[in-house]
Amino acid sequence: MLLRKSIPYIKICRDISASVRNNKEIAQKLPLSVPLPMENNSKSIEKGCPPMGRNSRVTRLPNGLKVCTEDTYGDFVTVGVAIESGCRYENGFPFGISRIVEKLAYNSSESFSSRDEVFAKLEENSGIVDCQSTRDTMMYAASCHRDGVDSVIHVLSDTIWKPIFDEQSLEQAKLTVSYENQDLPNRIEAIEILLTDWIHQAAFQNNTIGYPKFGNNSMDKIRVSDVYGFLSRAHTPQRMVVGGVGVGHDEFVSIISRHFDLNKSTWTTQPTVLPAKIPEIDESRAQYTGGELRLDTDLTKLTIGKPYPLLSHVVLGLEGCSYKDEDFVAFCVLQSLLGGGGAFSAGGPGKGMYARMYTELMNRHHWIYSAIAHNHSYSDSGVFTVTASSPPENINDALILLVHQILQLQQGVEPTELARARTQLRSHLMMNLEVRPVLFEDMVRQVLGHGDRKQPEEYAEKIEKVTNSDIIRVTERLLASKPSLVGYGDIKKLKDLRSLDQAVAKRDLKYLFN
């Protein structure tokens, strides 16, 4: 009986083996430049799962909360909340409070008396959670089995709306943040994180996205009431987007409607936890100022006992654009064209080796240890940066090369080079969105920033339309701004901002030579 039932499956396996064998024989005779003739067996598609297209849906609840979803295959889902919060909104509050909120996530709440209870509930549903703050967004996210969505949303809503803080938990969060602030400068892999924070401070001095995320925090001034006060201003439905990837939209909206009720928040039901006076959230527009931040310090301690050379680091920043700007995609293509990386490539060589930071800098100058371009865009402004690391004696030469790379973009780029940059950017976009947590973050960030979800195909079309004249135009736009400069390590030979400003304004490198 069992054998008779197995016969159809054996026949299917034989048919598949024969098909593979025939295709292999055909493939061996074809040159690599010719596509393989693939059979489209529509019957197998009909019997299996239907192809799943882009089906993002967004619903706005009566209280202003936006809920967005997108279907995916699989038994596991990613859900979470994106909040318009972060260090850019800390003006009026003690600086560093966003990181304190981040460290206090998933602790005691109205329904869970301890962190252990929270994670016990998550374990029942194979769930993992995370909370991260950036300059303009606070992200609470969880991945779990689809049967546990209701329970995990309960955990998320409690940590966002109904947390219970005390002096002990606050002191523990302060210790964690203090340790991270002390530890970051001692870690080689954290240099890029610190440089990114410092270039924002230099580019947007004393305003919005220029407020520091690391170090220089006034944590001693933070009280439990201050944390509740910050949450009462930032954690409002109008500043939130709840998202789910792999969940049914209508059912998810129903779950969110039950759990996300502002009237049941800790600061609403217990107003005594709030301070007497709570500052309003700073909604002012980011003002790019340009500026300089020099951190002349001995980095020898980073090289002791490690196969890592003694390096100095320089970052050149110029005013970029917001992600709502018409030139946003062109700036992204420009970043892809410049590319970059390090002298050591984990996982093997070949990633981005045709980008200009490789071909023009690292391949021609052996003393350049790393060079990379970044495009940081926010709702109202942005900063475009190029970074290089070299031995201290070459750090000013590294700055000259970075400026030269930007200046020569005024002449345009070769068609093949531009086509490669566009293709690589589209490839990164599509491949990253194959990862469920990345798809979730992309979706909620778009709804938070634009109010709707733009499909990747729309961006792919815009990327393909970027021309040489667009690259020249955004380059001129960069060079029209005042530069920002960050130096870290032994930077005694690094020219100052005044010399850099003259070189950029007059399009002449002579001002940077000693």
From Swiss-Prot:
SUPFAM superfamilies: LuxS/MPP-like metallohydrolase. InterPro entries: Metalloenz_LuxS/M16, MPP/UQCRC_Complex, Pept_M16_N, Peptidase_M16_C. Coiled coil: none annotated. Gene3D superfamilies: Metalloenzyme, LuxS/M16 peptidase-like (3.30.830.10). Its main location: mitochondrion. Residues 1-55 form a transit peptide. Disruption phenotype: RNAi-mediated knockdown causes 63 percent embryonic lethality. Embryonic lethality is further increased in simultaneous RNAi-mediated knockdown of mppa-1 and mppb-1 or ucr-1 and mppa-1. One of its GO terms (cellular component) is mitochondrion. The keyword DNA repair does not apply. GO terms for molecular function: metal ion binding. It comes from the Eukaryota. GO terms for biological process: protein processing involved in protein targeting to mitochondrion; proteolysis. The keyword Transit peptide applies. Keywords: Mitochondrion, Transit peptide. It is found in: Mitochondrion matrix. Belongs to the peptidase M16 family. Substrate recognition and binding subunit of the essential mitochondrial processing protease (MPP), which cleaves the mitochondrial sequence off newly imported precursors proteins. Heterodimer of mppa-1 (alpha) and mppb-1 (beta) subunits, forming the mitochondrial processing protease (MPP) in which mppa-1 is involved in substrate recognition and binding and mppb-1 is the catalytic subunit. This is Mitochondrial-processing peptidase subunit alpha.
